Amino acid sequence: MKNERIFYATIDEQIEKLKRQGLIIDDIDFAKAQLELYGYSNLIKSYRDPYTIISEDQKVYRSGITFNQVLSLYILDKNLRNAVMASMLDLEEHVKEAAADIIASKYGTNPNDYLQFRNYVNKKKRKQRFSLPAILDKLKGALNTDKDPIAHYSQKYGAVPPWILFKSIYFSTIVNFINLFKPEEQLALAEKLYDADALNIHGNSLVSLMLDTLFICIEYRNLAAHGGRTYNHECKSRLRLSMESNNRIHGFSQLLFLLNMLKYQLPFKHLSKSLNHQLNRHCSMYPEDITYLGQILNVNIVQRTPVWVASKSNRYHMDRHCCGIKNPIELELADAQKQGLHPCKKCCHEDF
């Protein structure tokens, strides 16, 4: 079959195409600026599907859909993607430190000792770069650098402990290395990362939970790093844990579920807070999207818009730090409006 040609289109031509497809554009100049900034493919092609139908073999927008609505969904996902990246970097640092502690406590702090082949399990790997020989070569190769902190430890102590070496290694390499730990070390690491008694998960099941979680986190980290659509992503990596709640979760809610099981809660809290903020922002402007996003994200969306008020003031603020207010009082937006308070002109605007 002959491939369809891809044609270049100017911003003006992109605008005309969107209008022909029925998308409502209230501010042409604003729409042009956003397309120039983010790109048609990133903004429109990646986020139009919930808002389009096929009519007479043509893709058209459903009645009433605006450019700003598509843009808002894009912004939701962009901010969610950034939050995923931040949370995964935080988790990465924690996991590397925990893994290094397990290795150092068992095999010492000298790489000549802790990077011995016999200390790990040589599993057959589909990808050669994640085999034990390849990973050990990569770890040993990272020792040969003139960059700190590895160079500093090599020169001053003649050895680089694992908690320093792991800093310079990709998270995916570390996770695949953990997968090659001996069962005793894997369990010790899992018990460091989880409260096994509170979860009532022990032994091999706890190790499987840890490994599955780490591989799912790698997938989301890589997705976020390469600008992939995040809010409706379905992981290729699978969770083997058998429990009733696991049967009901998928996609982004699964990531939150797994992060919430860890002892270290900051990655979960940061990501959950970002999701709630973005859903509140988007759904307060486009409540018709609540059902769709609730189903995709597998969450119960309850609109909540907090605002802040200074004592003896008749204005409410979306930004609690606006105008240097001290000891702000938090209210629901609806309550502030019922009390006759007025929005601050500085911080109360459409928060794209």
Q: What does each of the following model-derived ranges do?
A:
Residues 302-352:
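Mature, structured domains enriched in cysteine- and short glycine motifs
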